Amino acid sequence: MEINPYLMFLNNDVTSLISTTYPYTGPPPMSHGSSTKYTLETIKRTYDYSRTSVEKTSKVFNIPRRKFCNCLEDKDDLVKPTGNVDISSLLGLAEMMEKRMGEGFFKHCVMEAETEILKMHFSRLTEGRQTYDWTSERNMPAATALQLTVDAIKETEGPFKGTTMLEYCNKMIEMLDWKEVKFRKVKTMVRREKDKRSGKEIKTKVPVMGIDSIKHDEFLIRALTINTMAKDGERGKLQRRAIATPGMIVRPFSKIVETVAQKICEKLKESGLPVGGNEKKAKLKTTVTSLNARMNSDQFAVNITGDNSKWNECQQPEAYLALLAYITKDSSDLMKDLCSVAPVLFCNKFVKLGQGIRLSNKRKTKEVIIKAEKMGKYKNLMREEYKNLFEPLEKYIQKDVCFLPGGMLMGMFNMLSTVLGVSTLCYMDEELKAKGCFWTGLQSSDDFVLFAVASNWSNIHWTIRRFNAVCKLIGINMSLEKSYGSLPELFEFTSMFFDGEFVSNLAMELPAFTTAGVNEGVDFTAAMSIIKTNMINNSLSPSTALMALRICLQEFRATYRVHPWDSKVKGGRMKIINEFIKTIESKDGLLIADGGKLMNNISTLHIPEEVLKFEKMDEQYRNRVFNPKNPFTNFDKTIDIFRAHGPIRVEENEAVVSTHSFRTRANRTLLNTDMRAMMAEEKRYQMVCDIFKSVFESADINPPIGAMSIGEAIEEKLLERAKMKRDIGAIEDSEYEEIKDIIRDAKKARIESR
């Protein structure tokens, strides 16, 4: 039988079909499986872009160590990205930046950061998400990983009494010199027991908390390991990317560096970090307007919406070390030492390769995973694609980690890399001055906009090429294919579109306009508050807002199957509602959820419909809607709002509490969930209670109710009620016995049906 797709239009109204045309309404694709391939690709790219073969054996780990700074060999290929940083150029750019911002700019920023760091409590490290835990060698929540590290200090040396971030940092540096580190580890022991009845042997796995210890060399590698995962939820990309999470030994030092970089970013007008939202838009607007003030009458500007290719692979920790040394040159010795630790640790990092590579035979009938530590042994089984990835890196791999002295992994030093990017935007030299050209722009991590200013087109070309050359010196590669230039005040920056002023990207907010599905009372009020917010942010014009309101209304009615009382729409729910409406005189006071009409318009978006219709309601109807004793009435302080991108927004619930503010409950039994272990424990507890009660009859113990199916629960309840009625005298003994017999028969039937 053929399926005609146009049949879809017969049974659905237009507004419900909008969701089929809009691609952002579904969840983004998740990545699953092994992340080894993506990690190997990242490492191989980092080594390729270094454009050098200068290597020296590392004294600590005895692995060849590639040099990533001041040693560019392949200078011909101008298209391929370069990650080789020229340190003297970098320091020159930092000096220009300080001159422009005023003498002592860096010193002042570091002093601000220092006062904050000295007060900082080390529990701030629990704020992160997933963190690599070096004791169990897998990812854990940040708070757990921190606790396990503190436990390791306790096992080796005694309790950790520090409270501030500095004391924690000092302890981490001490730890790197310890000859042996002890830590807690959960091990599973297999216990064998003989069953007395059958005589068979039963194996049970018992988790036991033990204490493990590792030597100095092994601990160093674990401390410097960065775990990798595949990035989740990326739209419009076929290939996945690897993201990284460092361990709890590197975290405190990177936190300190980011604090210093944040203080600098706050004062740079070209930086898009760390502010966000409307504040960010205002900051960018001032940068654009100040550009117009700097231009002469014969000059004009071109906007380049830029894209940097392979930002992370071309960032070098050695370059960061030099930059931080320059930033802290006039500061205290404490800050000089603290800021140098994080880049040095990243210069010696090991990257965890993940689960391994999956193989299948030619018929695709069998699958096997080669674990990361055994890849060298079985490389003859790999496909060509994997072999070409693995063989150049073989000399850097130790067990399941790979030594990577250069390159950053995704999401490490966002603020510091912004400082590095802004330093190129501050560049000025004699040749540019002579031609009457200059540039400025905006930078936010790897995203940037360039405003090139000159008096004629050939000079504009020259200026842009000059900018590209300056960037190449410090490992920033502007992608010439993906960047595009346009007329003044037309650009895109961090998903914000600018055309004289910021134009909203309404597509991202569309899913929030739809019915949230909480309940009839909250849904429409929540949608109205979102439309109101978007009108305040200049995202919606009045006519578009009115259209959005009408679409919300249509979808609300389609979701809850409630249509206007005079629409003559037939349906199971409308039958009941129409009977109820006949009893009401003033039909203007009906709520939308009871078959009423829309009373709100753009000027009354902030007023809930219950308030507007309050005066027009019949007294009887009003008392029924706003009845505090009604069991359905319930109020939530906040409401979750879903968006196409970014996290779920939690907003204040402005809805008026009425009979429609009900909360639906899901009925789930424990039997089909992962609570079975809990149930087994409860049964054991019940057994112990019964034994105890049989010995000590006067003991006051509350025995657990135990696991019950719904059928058993109903029987138990009925018996209890019948007994209570008999005690009061509402029913006689003969009736009580009859009820007991009926329940016994039902129980028997239920057990037999199993």
UniProtKB/Swiss-Prot annotation:
GO cellular component: host cell cytoplasm; host cell nucleus
Reaction(s) catalysed by this chain's protein: RNA(n) + a ribonucleoside 5'-triphosphate = RNA(n+1) + diphosphate
Gene Ontology MF annotations: nucleotide binding; RNA binding; RNA-directed RNA polymerase activity
EC number: 2.7.7.48
Gene Ontology BP annotations: DNA-templated transcription; symbiont-mediated suppression of host gene expression; symbiont-mediated suppression of host mRNA transcription via inhibition of RNA polymerase II activity; viral RNA genome replication; viral transcription
Region spans: Promoter-binding site: 251-258
Subcellular location per the Swiss-Prot or TrEMBL entry: Host nucleus; Host cytoplasm
Keywords per UniProt: Eukaryotic host gene expression shutoff by virus, Eukaryotic host transcription shutoff by virus, Host cytoplasm, Host gene expression shutoff by virus, Host nucleus, Host-virus interaction, Inhibition of host RNA polymerase II by virus, Nucleotide-binding, Nucleotidyltransferase, Phosphoprotein, RNA-directed RNA polymerase, Transferase, Viral RNA replication, Viral transcription
Domain RdRp catalytic: 288-484
Family: Belongs to the influenza viruses polymerase PB1 family.
Subunit structure, interactors included: Influenza RNA polymerase is composed of three subunits: PB1, PB2 and PA. Interacts (via N-terminus) with PA (via C-terminus). Interacts (via C-terminus) with PB2 (via N-terminus); this interaction is essential for transcription initiation.
Its biological purpose: RNA-dependent RNA polymerase which is responsible for replication and transcription of virus RNA segments. The transcription of viral mRNAs occurs by a unique mechanism called cap-snatching. 5' methylated caps of cellular mRNAs are cleaved after 10-13 nucleotides by PA. In turn, these short capped RNAs are used as primers by PB1 for transcription of viral mRNAs. During virus replication, PB1 initiates RNA synthesis and copy vRNA into complementary RNA (cRNA) which in turn serves as a template for the production of more vRNAs.
The protein's name in its UniProt record: RNA-directed RNA polymerase catalytic subunit
